[in-house]
Structure formats: C-alpha cells, structure tokens
Amino acid sequence: MEDGTPKHIIQMTGFKMEEKEALVKLLLKLDCTFIKSEKYKNCTHLIAERLCKSEKFLAACAAGKWILTKDYIIHSAKSGRWLDETTYEWGYKIEKDSRYSPQMQSAPKRWREELKRTGAPGAFHRWKVVLLVRTDKRSDSLIRVLEAGKANVILPKSSPSGITHVIASNARIKAEKEKDNFKAPFYPIQYLGDFLLEKEIQNDEDSQTNSVWTEHSNEETNKDFRKDAGFLEMKGALRETMYRTQKEMQNHEDVNVGSILIQHHKKEKFSGSSKDLKFVKMRNTFGSHTYENQKEIKKKDEDIQRSYTLRRKRKKGKESNCKKGVEHEKIKSTLRRHIYNRDQKEMKNSIFAEYAKESKAMAIKTDVDVVEIKNTLRKHIYRAQAVRYNCIRIDKQPVYNVEVKNAEFPRGVLNLIESLIEGHFFKEAIEELSTLQAHYIPPVCVLHALLENVLQDNIDTFSGRYFHILSALLHLHPPWKSPAMSRYYLELFQCPTCMKGAWSLVEVLIRSCLFNESFCHQISENIGSKVLHLTLLKFFFNLIESEVQHLSQKLYDWSDSQNLKITGKAMLLEIFWSGSETSGLLTKPVNMLLEWTIYSHKEKFKSNDVFKHELAYLLAGILGAAIDYWIFLGLKMGRNVMRHMSDDLGSYVSLSCDDFSSQELEIFICSFSSSWLQMFVAEAVFKKLCLQSSGSVSSEPLSLQKMVYSYLPALGKTGVLGSGKIQVSKKIGQRPCFDSQRTLLMLNGTKQKQVEGLPELLDLNLAKCSSSLKKLKKKSEGELSCSKENCPSVVKKMNFHKTNLKGETALHRACINNQVEKLILLLSLPGIDINVKDNAGWTPLHEACNYGNTVCVQEILQRCPEVDLLTQVDGVTPLHDALSNGHVEIGKLLLQHGGPVLLQQRNAKGELPLDYVVSPQIKEELFAITKIEDTVENFHAQAEKHFHYQQLEFGSFLLSRMLLNFCSIFDLSSEFILASKGLTHLNELLMACKSHKETTSVHTDWLLDLYAGNIKTLQKLPHILKELPENLKVCPGVHTEALMITLEMMCRSVMEFS
C-alpha cells in the first residue's frame, strides 16, 4: 500500500458462511482491517455478494463508500496488494438482462461520485428525521442507515420545527397524519431503499434554489418564446410571399422579381430589439411592392404583344423584343429546372417513406412471429407442468380472482360455538361448525380458539375432526379463490397465542418435529404433541401445493393471452419472498428450509423411524412446491430461471450433501416432488463427482447440448478418473488437506500434531504396542472405571453438548488429548452421540485414530456398538486416518470390528487405506485379519473394478435424472416434434427468429436460444450415439442401461417424426 493511503477497513454483506470464510482467508494476505459484524460500521470498503437492500448496503451507499464485488479481494490477494477499485465497483457495468433496474445497479457508483463531487458528508445530510417505528432491531438498523448518511434523527417527543421527513410503518402513517403533530411529509420505511437505489440523485442545494431558478428560467423562456414566435411568423410570411412571387414570375414571365427580392432582403435585416415593428413595416412594404410589380408585369406584356405585331415594320423594336425574349427564356428554363428538381426530390422522399413503412411493417411482422413462437414454446412448458400437477381439465375456468361473496357467519351461531368452546364442549362445537361449513367461511377467531385447545392437548379425541374441517375449508375455499381468501389464510395459519405470522409458525413446527425444541409458548409436552405438529405441517403442505397447482393451471389456460395478471399475493410468495415477485431465490426462509430438508434426510438414513421418514418427505415436498412456484413466476416474467437455479440452488445443495453416500444421494434426489429441483441438484452433484478432475467446466446453464456434448463423454471417462492424483507429504497427525477443508482449517486453526515425519512401518515394535495396549486396558478396567452414579459432581460440571469455535465437543477433546477417564465417563452418559461431528466433519473416533490414542479407540469400539466406522470427510475414514499416520495397531482393531468393507473405501484422491502401508509384510498382516481367501493384489484389482462400476452407475443415475426431467420440463417429446412439423421446420423458424433478434437487439431471448440448441442437438443425436464410449454400452448396471434406453428412444422419435 502506498504511503499516505488510508488503511482498508472491510465489511461484507450477502455471502454464505463458506464463501465468506474463504474471502476472509484471502484478506489475511492483505493489509487491512476486517470487521465481522452484522451491523454497519464505519468501513471504507463494503464487499457485496449482490445488489440488495440490506443495512450495510444502504448505509454504505448513503455514506458514499466503495461497494465492490468479491473479485476485488480475489484479484488483490493474487497480486499481493490492493488494486484500483474502479473496475470492481457495483455500477461500473450495467447488465441489460439483469433482474435489477439500471438505476439500482448504478446506485453505489452514483452516490459515491455525487458525494465526492459536492463534498456533502452524506446522502441525508440536510434531513431532520422523526422515526415512528417500534423500538427493536429494525429501528436500530434504520437509525444506523440514516446516521451513515449524516441525517439528524430526532426523538418523536422532542420534535422541534424544521423536520423534513417523518418515517413510519404503513400501519401508523394514516393515524399520525390525522393527528397532524408533525408539519412534515410522511414516508414508509421502504422509502429509504427506494431513495438510495431507485431514484435519481437530486442535490439539496439545487433543490433549495429550485424555486428561484424556476421563476427566472420561466421569465427567460417567455422572452425567448415571444422572440421566437415573431421570428417564425416573419419567416413564414417571407416564404409565402417568395412562393407567390415565383408563381407570378412563372405565369407572367417577369424578369425583375428575383433582383427586387434580393435587394429588399438586404434592406430588411432583422434586429433583436425591434423585430415586431420592422416585421410589420417590411410586410406592408413587401405587399405594396408586389402589387406594383404585378401592374408593371401586365403593362409589359401588352407592350410585348404590340411589339410582335409590328416587328416587320419596326426592325429596331423587333431586335429589342428578341433580346428581351432570350432573357425571358433563360429565366423560364431556370425556374422550370428548379421546379423539376424540387418535384423529383419530393417524389424520392415519398418513395423512401413508402420503403421505410414497408420495412417497418416487415420488422413488426417478424417481431410478431418471434412473440408467437415464444408463446408456443412457453405453452409447451406450461402444458408439461400442468400435466405434472394434474391440472389439465376439460372444464376450464376462465374467470379468476372473483371475490368470495359468502354470507356473514350468523352472529347467534357464532356466540353459541364460542360458548361451547369456553365450556370445553369441543365435540358439539366442531359439529356445529361442520354443519355450516358448506355455506359459510368459519371465522378465524373460532378456528384459532379450537387450535389453541388442540395444542394444549385438550381435544385429543376430536383433533382429527378439527383437521377435517381445515381440509374441507381448503377444498371449498382455496387461497387463490380471491385476494381476500389469501389474506384469510395468512391470518389463520399462525400461532393463536403469539400471532407472529405464518413463517414463525412453520419454523416452530419444523423445529419441534426435527430438533425436539420447545414451542413458541408453553404447551402440553407429550408424545402425541409432535404428531399434531406434523399434521399441521401436512395441512401447510397441502395449502401451498394447491397454490402451485392453481398457478400452473392458470399459466396453461391463459398461455394464449398476453395480458395474464395475477391479482393478490399468494401465501407462498408472502412467506418465502415477502411478497416480492422479483426477489432472488435464496432468501432466509428458503435457506433455512433447505438446511432442514437436508438434515431431516440425514436423520432419516440413520433410523427406520416412521415419524422421521414422514417428516423428511413433508419437508422435501414443501421445498419442491416453493421452488416450483418461484420458477413458474419467473417463466411468466421472462426470467432466465435456468441460470438462476443452476448458479444458486444446485451448488448450495451439493455442498451441503458432502457426507451422503451415493445410495443416500439417489434416495435424496428422488424424494423431491419438483422436477426442476431433481434436475439441478443432480447436475450439481454430477459436476462435483464426475468432473472434479476436469479443470474447465462450462458455466453455461444446463441444456440438452451440454448434457450430450459435455456430460456424456465425461461419464464415459469415469473409469480412468484415478489418474493425476495429488500427492501430499504425510506427517503424523496431519490429515491430507482437501479443497473443501482448507478454509475451515485456516480459520479454525490446525488441530493436528506437527511431527517431523512418518516412521517406516518396518521399524515398529508391534509386540511392544501389544503389551502397552494390555496394560492400558487393565488400567481402564480397574482404576479408570467411572459411571454417572459414582461421579455425580463431575457430571453436573460437564456440559457434553457444548462446543468450541471449531465445533469440537467434550468427546472430541477427550479423544484428542487421550483423556481415557473422561472418555469413559462421557460414554456412560445417556443421550451421548459418539458419531457427533465438528465443523469440519470429524468424529471423536477420527480424532482418536488420527492422534494414535489406542485405548480411546478400544473403549469406543467396546462401549459403542452404534459407532460409524464408515463415516468420512472427503472419503477419509477412521481407518484412513490411522494408517496414514502409521498407527497399525489401531488399524487392526478397526478391521476386527468393521471387516473387509473398510478396505474398499476410497478418499477423494481415490486412495485405499492399504495404499498408505509401505511394508508388504504389514499389508499382509492387516489383510489377514479380514479372513479373505485372496491376495492383496487381486483384492485391490476387484475393489478398483467395483469402484469404477459404482462411479459409472451413480453418474448414469445423475445424468438420467437430468435428461428425463429436462425432456419432461421442456416437453421434448414425439408429440412436440410432430406438432412442430418436424425438427427441420422448427429449427428453421428458431434460427430465423434468433438471427432477427441478434440484428435488432444486443441480447437474444434465453428461451429461443435454449430451444434452438435443443433442436440442433436432437438432430445430431443419432450420429452422436454411434460414437459413445464402449464402457457405457457394455456396463451391466441398471442405471447405465436405463440411460442408454432413454437415449435410444429419443433417437427413434427424432428419426421417425423428422
């Protein structure tokens, strides 16, 4: 950093934890101060993952700070110094096809430059603001944004004069306006974001002097207008007079008008001070002169006629007249030539105008064709989704969004039901409600009163009938029936006691079922309460699924219309995206739902508990419905959903599923009800597993072309993926550091011992190891024995669920430090989880094997039959850990308990556990423990073959999921090809549209590009299949065979209908 340059003070916003930690790692290489805080501090540079309206983003805008992309840190770290910020600033480049407006994209750059130019301390430096917002985290955040922009925030009670802005919640604005306590305009809370990101910058000094300048400019404009009006009137009169004079010259063949006009024009120069007067005078003079001229013309014509009759008698007169005739002819020819040129020019202009009209009409016609083709393609997608959701019906419903006109619930009946509920006559209350349900919508207060008693376990016997009422309500009066019904369900689906909104109830229900967490308020805690919570989640799933079905049907029914409008906000949109149709996919609720879904499947794979399986199914369904709704809205709005889904969701899910086996991943992917979700998660996993050895993976969104030309050849090479392994020098206690672990290790601090090198295994004294093991075992059985009963004081002091910054529990630390006594005590406690993982994914058994603590390993294996010997991080199992660090005795213990399957496990580099053993003798001893009647070489050869077979099978499954779902979503079926009059005809249409769009617009439509690529790939598919790798054709696996059959069927459709 140059001398005198202030030190960089960095904050970040919008990043996921993994990406943020990786950037922090890079910051350590640079001279800066990093502030890790959710609140805005007085930083110099804000690194933003995307454009947003977060506190830090708005505050940095208001303060005129540098708001930069993450590439600024990445490239600066690579250069070893801070680079110039200009090209990394948000707003440096404006993307035309972005979902953000150009105004919002350029806001950070505009505000920084504006504040620098004017020298103003902040965007709000002349504001005096009163905040009428409830005191909480939200109000504190608003104050920090205002203070960053140098606004003067004033307390409502001490409101002096001169207040410029009153910012309040929408609910309070109307009430406060009626009180009229503040002589200032009111603004909603979202005004701050709109002011900074959406509106043009208006200088406060300019706005103060605006009225003076406006008045002055109006006066000047009026003066100029009067002058211009006089000038235009004079110029028009001149043109008209000249035209009349030229016409008279043509008719009467006069020769003197041109010179008179020139003379007169020279005399009548325009003066700014007396234009009007001179104009009137000149016009009168010009008119009288023209009149005299006409008289003179008539007189001269008579003279000419007389001269021609007397030309034989008067030769001199004849010569004189001939001379005049020659002059007359010259002037006549000049005028005729001028008129001819003018007519030719007018005719040429009319031809150009007609051609321009024809070209415009052709362009409009081509645009219409493009729109028609795009609508046809969208209709195919909508139809495929409608089939998926069983929405195609014979009886269409053309009228939507009609307000529900049900009669008001009878007051007498309402009082009766309320009295029955208060008296705990729940059976009678539910019966009364059921009989009236077909004719009336039950009031929310009644359903809430019943729900409150259901949660308190007061209606145990009749809770089923209550949920039957909710199901009937959803069937008779769905949320999409009208905006009023949507509001009704948003009010209904919340905790009847806390009333914190729908998302709050969803979160509480999931946490109760998934983590056994307490409810948002005190309720009955019995075995059946979790079942009730699961039933409420089922109702929520049915509720949002009905909204997705309705939107799908509506898009299909109205696909021929250009004016499809969706009035009212769906529950899904309000809950997951705060009612914003333009919101990004991964909001906080969606992220939380993703994490819960993945965690629920991890729990499901550990047990056969029906409750856990049903919960995992429900969460996958809710997630799929939410994703589908966001995608359908994006298609309606023309958003490139393929790019957003591939970039955001797929990579996020694949990273979170690192510790899933291939079989678990298959079950996980197939559990999604959403075809889109299946497709993108399968692609993300495929890219990670099958393309990790390839350095260049295309960043283009998923397409048929990408699957056939990139993924299919990559799948054929899975048998040789073991080549080019990275070799890492081994140290005792130092695990091989894989890419996914490096950032965590850097931030958390390396937790392994650093010893010089790995000793040769031949030098190990195995007998000494065995004797020391026996001694330790004897000691652990005698002196170290301890239980919960005889050590109560220790148990009370020990919090075995507590973790340190690395995520290590008491079990991890006992195994790392070889604290056998503490380990035995911990293992005797109820509820202890021996398979618990730290932040990096390591278990206590991993740590004991890694550090060579043999007795700890033995105690775990003896006392915990549920210990997972196959648990892995990037493929590193406990056996990998033990043998890579030379702990052969531990390796023998693990093989005695785990068997030969442990020897078949590979890490991310493709290494087997025995690959770490240098000595053939030790290798044979370890192999003999498994009691396999085979040689180590043959065993490894079979393991290698089995491994590649599994890789090929799993890759085929992933590619099949992508291919089948893609063809289903975009309707690439034989019916589609037939309806398009064959691929050739459709390809010609798409190419024509594409070329037209490229000549008329910088950006082509993503849907046209996608289908054009799909059709081109389908046409070449028969030729491509002939060149498939041989291992794909001969592999006996079910998934590989299914993939080949799918491709062959697509080829038949192409050849048959083209």
UniProtKB/Swiss-Prot annotation:
It comes from the Eukaryota. Residues 12-77, 119-196 form the BRCT domain. GO terms for biological process: chromatin looping; DNA damage response; double-strand break repair via homologous recombination; positive regulation of double-strand break repair; positive regulation of maintenance of mitotic sister chromatid cohesion; positive regulation of protein-containing complex assembly; protein localization to site of double-strand break; protein sumoylation. It comes from Homo sapiens (Human). The gene is SLF1. CDD domains: BRCT_SLF1. Signal peptide: none annotated. This is SMC5-SMC6 complex localization factor protein 1. Transmembrane segments: none annotated. BRCT domains are necessary for its targeting to ionizing radiation-induced nuclear foci.
